[in-house]
Amino acid sequence: MWLAAVFTTHPFHRLARQCLQRATPAEPAVFCRSTHISFLRLASTPTLLKAYGATGLTNRDALIALGALMALPQVSESEEPPGTFALWQHIAARDSASPKVWMDAYLAAFAISGGVRLASLDHDFRNFVPHGLDLDLLLDA
């Protein structure tokens, strides 16, 4: 969602911006350390940058973009809520090797433990709704 909100040529830019505009200081869009790092990694990946017509961006540019998001009054950051680690282990446990589950399960556990709604473009987060995830699936908007 964060990357789509920043790159105007992202196919879901409009949806992501609308989601961000719905956030308020009382009910903010929340960054955690994992989403900070993921945003910075993706915002400085040459293949993605090329896809969005943003070649030549540096790590410093990605940090500036993150800073601009963090400066918005409706955006905040949060430390890991109590119980996140145990819940993450529980909902990530699979009887198969599923490397893509780790981050999704962590973000879901963070949102559940923190009592915040998770906005995403990724349908895979539906798997965590039975565990208590309050999901705003932007593609269904």
Regions found by a protein language model. Give the residues of each.
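Short, hydrophobic secondary-structure boundary micro-motifs
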Residues: 32, 51-52, 77-80, 137
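Amphipathic alpha-helical repeat scaffolds of TPR domains
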Residues: 37-40
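Short loop/helix-cap segments at secondary-structure boundaries that form the rim of catalytic
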Residues: 125-132
